[in-house]
Regions:
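Charged, often flexible domain-edge or linker segments that flank or initiate folded functional domains
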Residues: 1-310
Length: 310
């Protein structure tokens, strides 16, 4: 199952690679290095034929002795792990776009604290996000630190409703439900999770990544034409169903729980999970083995759909 699951992943990754671009940072492998270097803007990493990033193309002008010195900077590929999104709504007073965030903490550990800062843009039509790494701990004792962290990471949502960061107007939860049922909720990319040399890292999204999401939305109809039953437009359980409150906000179809990129990724995995059955049969597996492997892979897709939603 693991081997054929890897086959599905490789096939899907090849098709999805253009929609999940890998960027490289110019830095040394040894973060404690004292070697001075000029920072550079991140660069898009070209792809190999199999969809994997070709970081060697960016470092082609460096000799092997330079590469072997971990203290010297070079281009380091940081593949995208996940895009973080926030649903948005228009302020009923100033019409600015409000991101719906309960907290702005991206990571809050004793040795690693990452905060998503949020400021009104120049025209106050929305906000500008910025990922802040290495946020210091403030406060003399545990209670003070908790209170300070709460204030620093305060989002736009609370029990009373949604506060506009541009004009301060409070939109009640009923206002939010009205906007949702009128199909006026949007989405905005807030941050990108990447796979660094040692651990997961966070960075700001680039314009190319936001454009890829729009491109993905245009490809969904064609992709799901080859998948039985097409796009998951089936209705969600009613608001009376236990644990299902999203229909109150206009999310009344299964497909509305996913961003276009998430739906594109899920569709590609489904397509190749269906195709793997033929490949397994061609490799001489018995009928029982074919059915067992494909059933386990289908269960894995179900788990993926459960975890990969907005």
């Amino acid at each position: 199952v693991r081997a054929w699951g890897w086959w599905v992943l490789q096939q899907a990754r090849k098709e999805l690679a253009p929609f999940y671009p890998t960027y490289a940072d110019y830095e040394p492998l040894d973060k404690k290095s004292n070697v001075h270097y000029e920072p550079r803007e991140p660069r898009l990493v070209p792809l190999n034929d199999d969809g994997t990033p070709n970081i060697d193309a960016l470092n082609a002008d460096l000799d092997q002795s330079y590469i072997n010195d971990r203290a010297k900077p070079r281009w380091i590929a940081k593949p995208t792990v996940a895009y973080l999104w926030a649903r948005t709504v228009k302020c009923k007073n100033c019409r600015a776009t409000i991101p719906l965030l309960k907290t702005r903490w991206l990571c809050k550990k004793s040795n690693r604290r990452v905060l998503l800062s949020m400021e009104p843009n120049a025209h106050k039509t929305g906000v500008v996000f910025d990922v802040q790494n290495y946020v210091p701990i403030v406060g003399g004792n545990a209670a003070q630190r908790r209170e300070q962290d709460k204030r620093m990471g305060e989002g736009t949502m609370s029990r009373s409703g949604v506060k506009c960061p541009c004009c301060g107007t409070i939109m009640t939860m009923e206002d939010l439900r009205v906007e949702g049922k009128a199909d006026r909720l949007g989405m905005a990319m807030t941050a990108v999770v990447v796979d660094g040399p040692k651990t997961k890292e966070f960075r700001d999204p680039v314009s190319n990544e936001c454009a890829k999401s729009e491109e993905a939305a245009q490809m969904l109809a064609e992709l799901f034409e080859v998948i039985p039953f097409g796009l998951p437009t089936e209705p969600l359980p009613s608001k009376e169903a236990l644990g299902f409150r999203v229909p109150l906000y206009g999310l009344d179809q299964w497909q509305k729980l996913f961003t276009p990129l998430q739906m594109l990724a899920l569709g590609n995995v489904v397509k190749h999970t269906r195709a793997v059955k033929t490949v397994i049969e061609q490799n001489g597996y018995s009928k029982e083995w074919v059915e067992s492997i494909t059933a386990m892979l289908a269960i894995s897709v179900d788990k993926l759909a459960d975890r990969q939603s907005a």
